[in-house]
């Protein structure tokens, strides 16, 4: 509890006086966008950063809890992809007046849902391409274009985005993936903040092992 207030995932503006910083979940209107508690974006309109999410493609954008999405980040969905196994890439079937029925979905470059797990930091002006899966705790460097999956607790940068290093050693990554702090109650997370913000990784390992029993 801070200033007499309890964290509330249904609050839209978590920082008083800053309209360009919002918790995303309570603002969502599109049923094909699913966002977890306390994920925020540095903008006043999250859905304007999701493009080509057409109902006929049936794909979803799924984002976990406690993600941090910087200004200018764009999520490009499957509707942006064009058929590349035919002579022309022009999407006749999507535009009015052209005599073409939609091709079979097996002929379209559909890559499935885009999934961002929990506690992911996406840097400013990055682009997340269709069907990408980004693991828990990953960091996406600013101006990156992410077209392939990102393992948990991995830093990626560039266009196309490439992994530059794991954030922690394998033991700590495995502990964090088992611990799943983001799924715990608000009161428990509050008590865990000294560990979640600690840079003494040996101490963090010891405490998580203790918590896991």
Give the residues covered by each predicted segment:
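Short glycine-rich donor-binding/catalytic loop of glycosyltransferases
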Residues: 132, 143-144, 149-150, 161, ...
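Domain-scale signature associated with acetyltransferase and cell-envelope carbohydrate enzymes
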Residues: 1-119, 126, 161, 170-213
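Outer-envelope exported proteins of Gram-negative bacteria
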Residues: 64-66, 137, 141-143
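Beta-rich strand-turn-strand
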Residues: 110, 125-138, 146-148
């Amino acid at each position: 509890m801070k200033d007499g207030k309890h964290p509330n995932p249904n609050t839209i503006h978590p920082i008083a006086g800053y309209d360009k910083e919002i918790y995303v979940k309570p603002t969502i209107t599109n049923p094909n966008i699913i966002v977890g508690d306390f994920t925020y974006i540095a903008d006043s309109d999250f859905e304007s950063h999701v493009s080509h999410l057409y109902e006929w493609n049936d794909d979803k954008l799924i984002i976990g809890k406690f993600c941090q999405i910087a200004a200018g980040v764009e999520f490009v969905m499957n509707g942006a992809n064009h058929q590349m196994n035919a002579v022309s890439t022009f999407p006749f079937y999507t535009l009015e007046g052209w005599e073409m029925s939609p091709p079979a979905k097996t002929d379209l470059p559909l890559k499935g849902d885009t999934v961002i797990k929990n506690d992911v930091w996406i840097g400013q002006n990055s682009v997340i391409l269709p069907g990408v899966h980004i693991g828990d705790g990953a960091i996406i460097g600013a101006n990156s274009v992410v077209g392939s999956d990102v393992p948990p607790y991995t830093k990626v940068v560039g266009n196309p985005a490439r992994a530059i290093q794991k954030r922690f050693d394998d033991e700590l990554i495995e502990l964090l993936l088992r611990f799943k702090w983001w799924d715990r109650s608000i009161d428990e997370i509050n008590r865990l903040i000294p560990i979640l913000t600690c840079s003494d990784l040996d101490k963090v390992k010891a405490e998580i092992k203790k918590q896991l029993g």
